[in-house]
UniProtKB/Swiss-Prot annotation:
Its EC number is 2.1.1.174. The keyword Cell membrane does not apply. The keyword rRNA processing applies. One of its GO terms (molecular function) is nucleic acid binding. It comes from Shewanella putrefaciens (strain CN-32 / ATCC BAA-453). InterPro entries: DNA_methylase_N6_adenine_CS, rRNA_m2G-MeTrfase_RlmG, RsmC/RlmG, SAM-dependent_MTases_sf, Small_mtfrase_dom. The lineage of its organism: Bacteria, Pseudomonadati, Pseudomonadota, Gammaproteobacteria, Alteromonadales. The gene is rlmG. This is Ribosomal RNA large subunit methyltransferase G. Belongs to the methyltransferase superfamily. RlmG family.
Length: 378
């Protein structure tokens, strides 16, 4: 894994978060390099700057390296992004007192003079972010968005025009481009929240914009719901909860249990919490954590069941380290006799990992694409 970042005279050591990941993944990409290179070559002044979707702090570290007092306002939905930014500022002995952190639901400051963004995969979420910016940016404010050249097309430029202002793309460099959008100063309203029913379980669900499966059950969740374990569970974790549908259904099946919802996405945790209230479940039985797996779960929480639908993407990277960490955390935190119950794509071969960690693994159900697996802590 390459950890030495070098562009236009800026030298940094950058690691992904958590640091123990596959050796072929690094903490930045060419789009980060292109954005910093453009700023340095244009001799950009250290004005109040929002940094949006900075995966592990490459952009904030780069600007802090250039000017330790550069006022930075960092927005992300991912807890691991905040933790990675802290980690890399520390590794490079860079200050953090010039940096304020925001989730994608927090109110943004109104004194921004420049915005730097990485293009997220989820364009509905991107539109949400542009709309938020339209509510605080004065006319004429530049918003620079770096992305792979192949991701930039007329439809993407139309999203800029609809939600913030006119935009144009730079020439390509290392297969990336920087889009320059100029705010037109017209505030847009945020899109209305979409709510949809899951009639077979008498549930009503809503998702915020960066939550997987926008307005219907995804296939993995559906097969999981059809095969939830039955038992006298007292403490249940919905790990990587998304909109919380698995935990909500489990609460119906085990009304005496405490349900703990955990996700790296702040919007996912907020959606799960809203859905808990929407479905009139007991306020004292639902617990919600914005966290990197179970890293900061209170020690007194000792689940007897962990439900998990592991992601195999982190941003643009395809990786199984998140699933591996989820399984490790489950083994560490489960009570003796507790159960890990997961769904995954068949080709990911999670049964091998579970057999290695738990010394047992049972196939509960499967179809052409997905498999439900269960392992018990003994």
């Amino acid at each position: 894994m390459t950890t030495q970042f070098s562009v236009a005279g800026v030298e940094l050591e950058l690691l992904r978060y958590p640091a123990q990941q596959e050796s072929n993944l690094q903490a930045w990409d060419a789009a980060d390099e292109h954005l910093l290179k453009s700023l340095i070559e244009s001799e950009q002044a250290a004005v109040p700057t929002a940094i949006v979707n900075d995966s592990f702090g490459a952009l904030s570290c780069g600007l802090s390296k250039l000017h330790p007092s550069w006022p930075l306002f960092v927005e992300t939905d991912a807890r691991t992004s905040f933790l990675g930014t802290e980690q890399n500022h520390g590794r490079n002995q860079l200050p953090m007192d010039n940096l304020q952190r925001f989730t994608s639901r927090d109110t943004l400051p109104e004194n921004l003079a420049l915005v730097l963004m990485k293009l997220p995969k989820n364009l509905s979420y991107f539109a949400h972010q542009l709309t938020r910016l339209s509510q605080v940016l004065p006319a004429g404010t530049r918003v620079l968005v770096a992305a792979k050249a192949k991701s930039i097309n007329s439809a993407l430029l139309d999203i800029f025009a609809k939600h913030l202002g006119p935009a144009s793309a730079s020439l390509a460099w290392k297969n990336t481009r920087v889009i320059t959008c100029v705010s037109d100063g017209k505030p847009r309203p945020l899109a209305k929240e979409v709510t949809w029913a899951v009639p077979e379980y008498q549930l009503e669900i809503s998702n915020l914009s960066n939550v997987f499966a926008a307005n219907k059950l995804d296939i993995g969740a559906r097969i999981m719901l059809e095969n939830l374990p039955k038992g006298n569970f007292k403490s249940i974790v919905d790990l990587g909860c998304g909109n919380g549908v698995l935990g909500l259904r489990t609460a119906q099946l085990s009304p005496e249990a405490d349900i703990h919802f955990i996700d790296d996405s702040e919007m996912a945790v907020a959606s799960a919490k809203a859905n808990w209230a929407r479905n009139q479940l007991p306020a004292d039985k639902g617990h919600f954590y914005w966290d990197d797996c179970m890293t900061h779960l209170p020690e007194e929480v000792q689940p007897d069941l962990v439900l998990c639908n592991p992601p195999f993407h982190q941003g643009e990277a395809i990786t199984d380290h998140i699933a591996w960490q989820m399984f490790l955390d489950a083994r560490r935190r489960l009570k003796e006799g507790g159960i890990l119950h997961i769904v995954g794509n068949r080709h990911l071969a999670y049964h091998v990992k579970l057999q290695r960690l738990f010394k047992n693994c049972t196939t509960v159900a499967s179809n052409g694409k997905f498999v439900i697996l269960q392992a018990q802590k003994k």
